[in-house]
Amino acid sequence: MKPIVIIGAGISGLQAARLLEIQGANYFLLEKSNKIGGRVQSETVDGFVLDHGFQVLQTAYPEVQRSLDLKKLDLSYFGSGAYVYLTSHFQPFFNPFEKPFAFLRSLGSGLVTAKDLVLLGYVWFRLQRDVEALDGRKETVGELIDRLGFSTNFKSLFLRPFMSGVLLDARLSQPASLFYFYMKQFMEGKAAIPKAGIGAIASQLADIIPTNRIRLEAPVTHISADFVELESGEQLEFSQLILATEAPITSDLLGVSKADVEPLGSETFYFRAKGIYGMEPYLHLMPEGSPLLHFSCLTAIDPHSSLKGDYLFSATSLTIGISSEEIKRILADHLGVPASDFQFIKSFPIPHSLWRVSDFQTLKKEAEKRNIVLAGDYTQFPSLQAALSSGRLAAETVLEKVQ
């Protein structure tokens, strides 16, 4: 029988290949670049492990629990909550459901009001039910936050910056249901970083896949009814095809318009610092409107990430192209330390960190017409959960077809 062919060795493609391998299927995984993982990449610079963009592993995701061995990833965890910048200092906002007494102490800070506490109770009650990531309603996250009636300070200093970081969308124009979905994940799980970097997720998925099943530097240029053609001119026949590429590449390969593909970009900067400056293992949020979205001291999260007494900081902006000197200045000003304490290591501008939620009907209809199975987080919603889920569903679909 002709093999199943998977195009794209990002998380969705790796997940599909992993499950096909478990089922003993005949398949090949094609990847245009020289490495697996897609957007989920890490690299080591001057002894520091740097992720490509600010990426965390959410332990409560059902597909994460189903697919990954979290113990082997050797995770370090962010604290549940965040520090927000209030007037001239950072004020902790602890998860009220994890540290209720510490949270209550913040009521007099000016960040949270008694009404906010009541509204958070409503959100908590809402999260006790099953929460769909996408429920079909047209309301946006920003509109939902305004409608709920939280105080101005709580919205502008915590809710909006926090959700902007989750969605990489300053306008908060993603579906409102994602607000409840992500809040439930943060309430029930933890945000974590693998010791070897976020790229360890891709490596773990690939561990089970024999090297002769993966072909790197094998860009596909054309898809026919029963074969794919590589840039080299080689043709590979297939029985079933899984297209696990990014939405724009999928559009190109299917020959359809990219009109419904809208990327959400970000740039993450890494600095070596002389001190930890009393920072706790929490995300530090900047006020709404700041060119810097958030930052954290990764050494506070994983003390073993220090190199020769130095400390690793990451800082993320939704503005691609902002200078590292500007980011350094903002960091220094808000921590009250000299800018010379920070030494720039590297930045990762990623124009397509995530994709704005769309129904992608043009892509889906064309793929269905040609008997091609799509995979990728864009087919559901932007997250590791959706990438893993879509890869699993794609594998299950093609296995049913070939049986």
Regions found by a protein language model. Give the residues of each.
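Helical element adjacent to the flavin cofactor pocket in flavoenzyme catalytic cores
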Residues: 179-227, 240
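N-terminal Rossmann-like FAD-binding beta1-loop-alpha1 element of flavoenzymes
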Residues: 2-29, 399
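Conserved flavin/dinucleotide-binding core of flavoenzymes
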Residues: 298, 303-403
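Mid-domain catalytic core of redox enzymes
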Residues: 221-329, 333-334
